[in-house]
UniProtKB/Swiss-Prot annotation:
HAMAP family: Dephospho_CoA_kinase
Name listed for the protein in its UniProt record: Dephospho-CoA kinase
Phylogenetic classification of the source organism: Bacteria, Pseudomonadati, Spirochaetota, Spirochaetia, Spirochaetales
Any one GO cellular component localisation term in the record: cytoplasm
Organism field: Borreliella burgdorferi (strain ATCC 35210 / DSM 4680 / CIP 102532 / B31)
Function in brief: Catalyzes the phosphorylation of the 3'-hydroxyl group of dephosphocoenzyme A to form coenzyme A.
SUPFAM superfamilies in the cross-refs: P-loop containing nucleoside triphosphate hydrolases
Similarity comment: Belongs to the CoaE family.
Length: 205
């Protein structure tokens, strides 16, 4: 596989600001965003038969499509079920990401992925922005963005995602930590500072 000019990973728990940060960097600095979550949604269609075979007809809605809410409730209530889903989805997502990188070899890339380390995507990145936020702030954001999500489910998701950054020793990687507990204007300024540091470093490498 050829090498893109610059690849930045953006990771963090649910509602930590991954999409917002990726959008800022894409728009301001000319990066192409690869959104692993969106690729994961496409896998539900592509691997529908295999997923239904694993979890049964109970995950289908009235249109005979996989109901994302039903599937989410199922896998976040049982870690074994989550691993079954990941065993199907992760190899496909990884393959899609590598294909996009090949198709855009002259382009600067953002890889937006909550499970960046779990999927070994850090191996593709020059820098990784790790977003963190207080649980209380994450819960408020989720209550606003997903009105029908209950606090029980939020707690289960946060518990599962608790250690997504620390599953392995991180060496030879440029990690950039950002605490996203404030407003958009503050986050935008933080991103500008971090990106200027990256640009300056790359210029003299």
């Amino acid at each position: 596989m050829g090498r893109n000019p610059l690849i930045i990973g953006v990771t963090g728990r649910i509602a930590s600001g991954k999409d917002t940060v990726s959008k800022i960097i894409s728009n301001k600095y000319g990066f192409y965003e690869i959104n692993a979550d969106k690729l994961g949604h496409s896998v539900l269609h592509e691997k529908k038969e295999e997923i239904v075979k694993i979890f049964g007809q109970k995950i289908l809605n009235t249109k005979n499509e996989i109901d994302k809410l039903l599937l989410r409730n199922l896998v976040f209530n049982d870690n074994k079920e989550l691993k079954k889903l990941e065993s199907v989805s992760h190899p496909v997502i990884l393959s899609k990401i590598k294909k996009i990188l090949i198709q855009n070899q002259s382009t600067k890339i953002i890889i937006n992925a909550a499970l960046l380390f779990k999927m070994n995507l850090e191996k593709l990145c020059d820098y990784i922005i790790v977003l963190k936020a207080k649980n209380s702030i994450i819960k408020n954001r989720l209550s606003y963005s997903i009105p029908n999500i209950d606090s029980n489910m939020i707690n289960k998701i946060l518990k599962i995602q608790k250690d997504i950054f620390f599953e392995k020793n991180i060496i030879n990687l440029k990690i950039i930590n950002i605490i996203n507990n404030k407003n958009y204007a503050y986050l935008e300024k933080e991103i500008e500072k971090k990106m200027q540091g990256i640009i300056n470093y790359e210029r003299f490498e």
